[in-house]
Amino acid sequence: MFKSGFVTIVGRPNVGKSTLLNAIMKEKLSIVSCRPQTTRNNIQTILTEDNYQLVFVDTPGIHKPKHKLGEYMVKSASDAMKDVDLVLFLINPDEKPGRGDLFIIEQLKEVKVPVFLVLNKIDENPQEKVAETLKTYSELMEFEEIIPISALKGKNIDLLKELMFKYIPEGPQYYPEDMIIDQNERFIVAEIVREKALRLLSEEVPHGIAVEILQMKKNEKGTYHIEGNILCEKNSHKPIIIGKGGSKLKKISQYARQDIEAFLQSKVYIRLWVKVKEEWRDNQSLLKELGYKKMK
């Protein structure tokens, strides 16, 4: 008997959805940063074992949109809860249910598939706090399963996999067993660069950063030559991203190259520039060029 199903991970921004997905896959597949709203596209990730295949949809965190990109991110997360077989609602025990959580719960009450409540970061919180959070959420909605985990340390991840297998239906293998992600290499490379920029820039530059890959070629020796732009919204952000004498941009390139080489399993040369695109997050045509679906 072979089972297969689509699983959506939902939760507030910065709750650890991408970290959970990476823990399940044991690979760095989805951009992980300490800053909220770092996942911008639904990333379908495929886990294939001997007797099942799970297709995970890692979504942007649900939040009140402030621009066209924000609208896209929220719509993307909401759409991901439709036509799936299982939903994982990820929360942190140290945070009381906020408006974002209540908004998600109202949506979850409408879905016709099993919903798991997954408590992340249990290693960082006392048992009393975890129990209190469990009680609070259980009173808001009935969940098929409640699983405490630590995505960062991998605690109870195998248990979570076992429970997901229990609930998904019998079905075909949708993707080849050696395929782990349905996004192309260029998309992943852009996300790696963006993650490094977010980490190194800290609070100096807000979320108005995007990455466009201009060129990605592989020579006869198997070496990739990559060129790209880091887009920012204000002229004042450009020197911050570049840094004194180009130091910040050099670090972004260096750290990105290391992860890109691990991802592509090849030597990589990368050149990055910084380009100002004012209000790019409200530019529908540019958002489309960067890979974001058109808003209806």
Curated annotation (Swiss-Prot):
Q: Which SUPFAM superfamilies match?
A: P-loop containing nucleoside triphosphate hydrolases, Prokaryotic type KH domain (KH-domain type II)
Give me any GO biological process, just one: ribosomal small subunit assembly
The entry's localization annotation reads: Cytoplasm; Cell membrane
| Superkingdom field | Bacteria
Q: How does it assemble?
A: Monomer.
User: Could you say which residues bind GTP here?
Assistant: 11-18, 58-62, 120-123
According to the record, the residues making up region (G3) are: 58-61
Q: Where is this region: G5?
A: 149-151
The keyword Zinc is annotated on this UniProt entry: no
Which cellular components does GO assign to this protein?
cytosol; plasma membrane
Family of the protein in this entry: Belongs to the TRAFAC class TrmE-Era-EngA-EngB-Septin-like GTPase superfamily. Era GTPase family.
In its UniProt record, a GO molecular function of this protein is:
ribosomal small subunit binding
Instruction: Relate the protein's function as given in its record.
Output: An essential GTPase that binds both GDP and GTP, with rapid nucleotide exchange. Plays a role in 16S rRNA processing and 30S ribosomal subunit biogenesis and possibly also in cell cycle regulation and energy metabolism.
Q: Which Pfam families is this protein grouped with?
A: KH_2, MMR_HSR1
User: What PROSITE patterns does the entry give?
Assistant: G_ERA, KH_TYPE_2
Known CDD domains for this protein?
Answer: Era, KH-II_Era
Region annotation (G1) ranges:
11-18
Stretch list, region G4: 120-123
What name appears for this protein in its UniProt entry? GTPase Era
Region entry G2: which residue ranges? 37-41
- How is the protein disposed in the membrane? Peripheral membrane protein
Boundaries of each KH type-2 domain copy?
A: 201-278
